[in-house]
Regions:
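A short helix->beta-strand "capping" segment at the edge of beta-propeller domains
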Residues: 41-67
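Surface-exposed loop and turn segments in beta-propeller and other repeat-based domains
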Residues: 56-65, 100-111, 194-207, 241-271, ...
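Beta-strand-rich domains and repeat architectures in extracellular enzymes and scaffolds
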Residues: 57-88
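Repeated scaffold domains used in trafficking and secretory/extracellular systems
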Residues: 68-72, 113-118, 154-161, 204-211, ...
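Short beta-strand elements that form the blades of beta-propeller/WD-repeat-like
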Residues: 77-85, 125-131, 165-176, 216-224, ...
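Short loop/turn segments that connect beta-strands within beta-propeller blades
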Residues: 93-97, 140-144, 187-191, 233-236, ...
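Blade-loop segments of beta-propeller domains
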Residues: 98-124, 131
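Asp-box/WD-like beta-propeller blade repeats and closely related beta-sheet repeat scaffolds
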Residues: 134-163, 169-175, 195-201
């Protein structure tokens, strides 16, 4: 794998709020009539990650200074960016070498603001940040100097660059429905936004960071809501590639609804899922001609299971992965160039599972971590085998 070929991709994993799907109906559009298949989440297998990937690579993030706990990663060619877990900093790397850091946004101590999310804009080499005070902050690279601050409307849950002055966003929309969301094109020079797709209901915990995924010719937007959708933005148009809806198994009839149409339905639906600790959605879809994969965390027997659903027109399996000898749940932190990416930053003593022997991959991970200055993070890139369903 050539790291320099990595296209602009975005992370979207939040550790606490992940989807639960007891069984779902999913409709994939493949140029012909969409197919309707019911997926049973209990149909899953556990296996070693090494048995299910066709290639992988490990990259240490190189820095002479300590890197705080990071999340919300993204990559563009040789450039990569990470937000600190405390939502205060953004780190900038080239070829995995530390270049600079945005230490804070705001006027000074006591007035620093949290970074809700951000995107790199390759068209003008800037970072666009959405802060907690309903503003866009644009910073130049590599010096991280403030270029301008622009007022914005609504809470922004995700951003993706379209040109030097416009970005694609998912953000709060009150035009037609209370507390709804929409997909917008926003001008970051003046904050003006144009609604291109309404989303009447989405999970309030969805899109804590960027989940957009870029293909060769389009942008994929996974929407966790009712229904869940994988939306494609291509040639200035929006279309659904997949629609994922719940079956009503284990969900009371008065709660279950394929389409949320009223505020009362929305509140009942939301309250039920919160009170029963259910989560909904789909994350990190990668769609090819032969295979679709996406991730979810169903709650089975009162325990969260971290799973990847692999699907084609004839079969499907839910996979739970592990790396022998490594104490680390396997669910990606972002997608880059068709690869899933894990940010590994746990202490080595915690990572090593003494109950089993280290696999070849596990040994490479530990050896790389031991060489890191300041216990800084490393990245594990991996690509799922296209034939994974045929081998299980």
């Amino acid at each position: 794998m050539n790291k320099n070929s990595i296209s602009l991709k975005f992370k979207h994993l939040y550790e606490m709020f992940k989807p639960t799907i007891l069984s779902v109906a999913i409709f994939f559009s493949c140029g012909e009539k969409p197919q309707n298949t019911t997926f049973d989440i209990t149909k899953h297998i556990e296996c070693s990650l090494e048995d299910c990937i066709e290639e992988y690579a490990i990259y240490p993030l190189k820095s002479d200074i300590p890197i705080n706990q990071i999340e919300f990663g993204m990559a563009f060619d040789s450039l990569s960016f990470y937000k600190s877990s405390n939502s205060k900093e953004i780190y900038y790397f080239v070829n995995n070498e530390y270049i600079s850091k945005l230490a804070s946004i705001g006027r000074g101590p006591g007035e620093y603001m949290n970074i809700n999310n951000y995107t790199y804009n390759p068209y003008n080499n800037t970072i666009v940040i959405s802060s907690e005070n309903e503003k866009f902050h644009i910073y130049s690279l590599p010096d991280m100097n403030l270029v301008r601050t622009v007022n914005r409307d609504g809470f922004v849950k995700g951003m993706y660059p379209l040109s030097d002055s416009t970005i694609l966003t998912v953000n709060h929309c009150d035009e037609k429905f209370q507390n709804g969301y929409g997909i917008y094109i926003v001008n970051v020079n003046n904050g003006h936004r144009t609604l291109i797709e309404e989303i009447p209901y989405i999970n309030s915990f969805w899109f804590s960071g960027n989940e957009f995924t870029q293909t060769d010719s389009s942008i994929l937007i996974p929407v966790s809501g009712c229904p869940n959708r994988i939306i494609e933005y291509k040639n200035n148009k929006i279309s659904d590639l997949a629609t994922i809806t719940f079956n009503n198994n284990n969900i009371p009839k008065e709660i279950y609804a394929k389409e949320i149409s009223t505020i009362d339905e929305k509140m009942n639906f939301t309250n039920f899922f919160l009170e029963n600790d259910y989560k909904i959605g789909c994350f990190y879809p990668i769609i090819t001609n032969s295979l679709t994969t996406l991730w979810h965390t169903p709650k089975i027997n009162n325990q969260y299971q971290f799973m990847m659903l692999a699907y084609n027109n004839s079969s499907y399996i839910n996979f739970s992965f592990h790396i022998p000898g490594i104490n680390r749940r396997i669910i990606p932190d972002y997608v880059a160039d068709g690869y899933y990416v894990l940010i590994i930053q746990e202490p080595i003593d915690y990572l090593i599972d003494t109950s089993e022997s280290l696999s070849k991959l596990g040994k490479e991970i530990i050896d790389t971590m031991k060489k890191q200055n300041n216990n800084n993070p490393i990245l594990l890139y991996f690509k799922i085998k296209p034939s994974i369903l045929n081998e299980k």
